[in-house]
């Protein structure tokens, strides 16, 4: 056997052993239930993992704008749609995509809403790679759980049973009125969307298309995070996203109602 083949074989064996070790440790440290006491991150958003199979019509993704603006129980009461908000504070698009994939493991929503503030939250390649590594091997996301392992962690079985009564919505009691006198003043300005963010939205759109769901981009009112420049860029991006690949809908509820839904 040549030196090259020996070296290649050693590398393959090393990688195989490493993958087995990472898989085993990941099974040990990953939370066995979707509760904060079991160590899961963002338990309100991860409450969707405990919902009965195929009971969610509408999935909502985004940062704090999403879980503050959308009230799933109100959507159920007024329109009869079952919705769940997987929004988290300062959510990045790679985290939005991770929740999208987790939700579709047991659910088949026909509509996915992406709150658009998340499109402008920048992130590093390092954090993106760490998230993808954590999706593959949970030890990268839950490496600190070794300090709080319980007896049931050693059984390696995962059983998500926790559900959230508010379905991901988080009531904010400390909100104060904002000065909206110059909010959404008409402008032809455009705000740049980072290239990697565009790529993630395109991936989210492609996943929705492949799984029979429509993607709806929605801009919730925010005098701090939203303006006409971002609206204009998002509208142009949504138009391009839908060309030749089905309908990409964009609704900006910061605009007057007769202009808010642009299809």
Which positions does each model-derived feature cover?
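Membrane/wall-proximal cationic-aromatic binding patches
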Residues: 21-82, 92-98
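Structural motif
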Residues: 57-58, 111, 216
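Membrane-embedded segments
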Residues: 61, 65-145
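Hydrophobic beta-strand scaffold residues
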Residues: 83, 215, 249-250
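Secreted/periplasmic serine-hydrolase-like ester/acetyl group-modifying domain
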Residues: 125-214
């Amino acid at each position: 056997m040549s030196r090259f083949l020996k070296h290649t074989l050693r590398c393959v064996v090393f990688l195989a052993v490493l993958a087995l070790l990472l898989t085993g440790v990941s099974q040990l440290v990953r939370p066995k239930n979707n509760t904060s006491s079991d160590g899961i991150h963002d338990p309100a958003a991860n409450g969707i993992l405990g919902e009965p199979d195929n009971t969610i019509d509408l999935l909502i993704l985004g940062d704090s704008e999403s879980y503050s603006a959308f009230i799933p129980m109100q959507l159920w009461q007024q329109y009869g749609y079952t919705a769940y908000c997987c929004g988290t504070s300062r959510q990045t698009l790679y985290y939005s995509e991770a929740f999208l994939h987790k939700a579709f493991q047991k659910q088949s929503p026909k509509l996915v809403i992406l709150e658009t503030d998340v499109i402008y939250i920048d992130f590093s390649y390092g954090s993106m790679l760490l998230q993808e590594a954590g999706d593959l091997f949970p030890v990268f996301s839950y490496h600190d759980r070794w300090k709080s392992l319980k007896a049931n962690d050693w059984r390696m079985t995962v059983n998500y049973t926790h559900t959230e009564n508010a379905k991901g919505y988080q009531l904010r009691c400390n909100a104060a009125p904002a000065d909206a006198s110059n909010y959404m003043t008409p402008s032809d300005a455009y705000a740049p969307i980072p290239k990697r963010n565009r790529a993630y939205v395109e991936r989210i759109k492609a996943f929705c298309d492949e799984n029979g769901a429509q993607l709806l981009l929605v801009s919730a009112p925010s005098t701090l995070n939203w303006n006409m420049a971002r609206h204009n860029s998002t509208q142009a991006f949504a138009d391009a996203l839908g060309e030749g690949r089905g309908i990409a809908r964009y609704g900006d509820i910061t605009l007057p109602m007769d202009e808010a839904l642009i299809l």
